[in-house]
A protein has these predicted regions:
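Juxtamembrane helix-boundary/capping and inter-helix hinge elements in multi-pass membrane proteins
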Residues: 72-75, 85-90, 123-135, 162-175, ...
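Generic detector of multi-pass transmembrane helix bundles and their immediately adjacent loops
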Residues: 469, 475-578, 585-589
Length: 591
């Protein structure tokens, strides 16, 4: 075997390890892989960067803008008015009413904003009707995933595969070509959740309340009295800025709340200082002359709803630049003008100094910030804001109409095959821009450039796997394992490998990695690769067994108070169900 083969195989294995272990961001890993393949002369410059001009990547970028228009205009928020009834009925009826609309909408647009809008709505509705939100949040995430399997534009994974098919000399998938597998899978998957799966979900207390109760254990107030030697000095001068194990996040002066606190803020007699940190270090601080511990005072997060400062919850996204950094080095306060007062991971609060905590994807942050924080950051890709009391800022009704019309125009042109998909998406975006439905800032926020880098890099990696012989080598192993059962055995092998990978790394990366292997496997047994690639598309999106496998799973992980085990209990049977149905349908339609 050649140098290129061994070099590519080693780089390929290291790439998977780095992505699964989240050593650095996925987009950095994949782009670095392309550069290393280029350095090793496995691929040419043209092959390395062909993905940056691929129609699949460009289409995804345009679809981000269309989804952004639906999100920012408040069109998606209208879904809330339809799916939540006023009366309290049995949980199966409620799941019916919620999940089917979610799956339908997710079939035609990015499911992240759909779930982001529904999380606070479900929590608020559940609190009013005495339901447990944890009975609904995982089902909503799964419904969004199932809906995305039904059409070409339902998920970016399908569009990556569409672009790779064209790059490999094939005709791309049609808008509804995947539907004959996706729709039956979605229907049976939803019925499983509604009648069977939800019984395995826990009935957790509303997560915001849990965080509030835990926060009371670690937040205390100290009052400045006459004996304090640093009255009229700044926080920095008083030595309260860089305390070991403590953080001064707020000052209450008469009826005024000062938060976040700045190093230059002066301290005055009678100020109430709010510290968060480990109890033993707080008790050490109270020994300072002039700082009186207010034992009977209660830190109540809900008191801020009517003030200039209020609490927020945010879930760290899988592509966040905060991942791998501790809170201190992340400059969170300076970057977002908000203070972290608690961090929850895997359903429990992390009991250490906040500044030393290394942030991970899925962490739930309890924040204090000013009232405009939500408006400024609700569409950020760094974290998902899930504050119950907030609603998405709405736009005039005519802009809601424009955003919905843009999606309708795209679907009309694609269904009738009047224009190529990228051109149809471009026309829809022109409509949005011409009517100023989105501002320049909103357009930038709508486009997830990290995802686009992953997608563009995927084409160079796929080319490297193919030209080096690594894809053919792995494909041979799959063929040897499944050829006794014919084509269906090989497809099953591809489905299993893809399902395993997609539950521990992003579905986009999984699709890009497995595509050249799938293509090579079909060539080796001399059959049409199309059904194999459709199987890959379904398997790459079928991310149910872990919370880290899909962005919507990650979004509901913290707010639902779930553990890893909760996802596995409902998600693993779903994973098996989807695979079995897909294999049966592939056998029926293609083999």
């Amino acid at each position: 075997m050649s140098f290129e083969f061994w070099y590519t195989l080693i780089i390929f294995i290291l790439m998977i390890i780095f992505i699964i272990r989240e050593i650095v961001e996925t987009e950095i890993v994949m782009f670095s892989t392309v550069i290393l393949l280029l350095v090793g002369k496995v691929i040419t410059i043209e092959q390395a960067f062909i993905g940056f001009s691929n129609v699949g990547m460009l289409t995804i970028g345009l679809l981000f803008v269309i989804a952004g228009a639906l999100h920012y205009s408040g069109a998606i928020a209208q879904l809330n008015n339809f799916i939540f009834g006023r009366n309290k009925s049995v949980i199966t009826k409620k799941l019916f009413r919620i999940l089917f609309p979610v799956a339908t909408v997710s079939a035609f647009m990015n499911n992240t904003p759909v779930v982001a809008i529904l999380i606070p709505a479900i929590r608020s509705w559940a609190e009013r009707t005495n339901f447990s939100p944890s009975k609904f949040l995982i089902p909503v995430s799964y419904a969004a995933i199932l809906g995305g399997m039904c059409t070409l534009i339902g998920t970016s994974t399908n569009l990556i595969i569409y672009g790779l098919m064209i790059d490999f000399g094939m005709e791309g998938l049609g808008l509804f070509e995947i539907s004959k597998l996706g729709i039956p899978i979605a229907l049976l998957g939803l019925f499983y959740i509604i009648f069977i799966g939800h019984h395995s979900l826990p009935e957790h207390k509303e997560s915001f309340s849990m965080i509030e109760e835990k926060t009371r254990e670690f937040v205390l107030q100290l009052k400045i009295t006459n004996e304090y030697p640093h009255i009229e000095k700044t926080i920095e001068e008083a030595g309260l800025r860089h305390l070991q194990g403590l953080f001064l996040f707020q000052i209450q002066r008469n009826n005024q709340i000062i938060a976040p606190t700045k190093p230059t803020q002066k301290l005055k007699l009678g100020d109430r200082l709010f510290f968060t940190g480990l109890p033993k270090t707080i008790l050490e601080l109270q020994k300072t002359p002039g700082l009186e511990l207010l034992k009977d005072s209660i830190f109540d997060l809900k008191q801020y709803d009517a003030s200039m400062v209020r609490p927020y919850e945010a879930v760290i996204s899988a592509s966040s630049p905060l991942i791998g950094k501790n809170v201190r080095n992340s400059k969170f306060r300076e970057q977002y003008n908000a203070v972290i007062i608690a961090i929850h991971r895997n359903g429990t609060r992390i009991k250490k100094k906040i500044g030393d905590i290394i942030l991970q994807s899925g962490d739930t942050l309890l924040l204090l910030a000013e009232r405009d924080f939500y408006r400024q950051w609700y569409a950020s890709n760094d974290f998902y804001l899930i504050s119950q009391s907030e609603v998405v800022p709405s736009k005039p009704r005519w802009q809601v109409f424009v955003s919905v019309t843009s999606l309708g125009l795209l679907l009309f042109l694609m269904i009738l095959k009047l224009l190529p998909m990228v051109v149809a998406a471009g026309l829809a975006v022109i409509l949005i821009l011409a009517t100023r439905t989105l501002s320049a800032y909103e357009i930038r926020q709508s486009i997830d450039f990290r995802v686009l880098i992953i997608i563009a890099s995927a084409f160079g990696i796929a080319e490297g796997l193919r030209s080096s012989g690594v894809a053919e080598f792995i494909a041979q192993a799959i063929v040897l394992a499944g050829e006794s059962l014919g084509s269906i055995g090989v497809v099953t092998g591809i489905f299993i490998i893809t399902s395993l990978l997609t539950n521990f790394m992003t579905n986009n990366a999984t699709a890009a990695i497995v595509f050249p292997i799938t293509f090579a496997a079909a060539q080796q047994i001399h059959v049409d690769p199309r059904p194999f690639i459709i199987a890959l598309a379904i398997a790459a999106s079928a991310s149910f067994a872990t919370p880290i496998s899909y962005q919507t799973n990650l979004m509901v992980y913290g707010p639902g108070g779930y553990t890893f085990k909760d996802f596995f209990k409902i998600g693993f049977p779903m994973q098996i169900l989807v695979m079995v149905i897909a294999i049966i349908l592939l056998q029926l339609f293609y083999f």
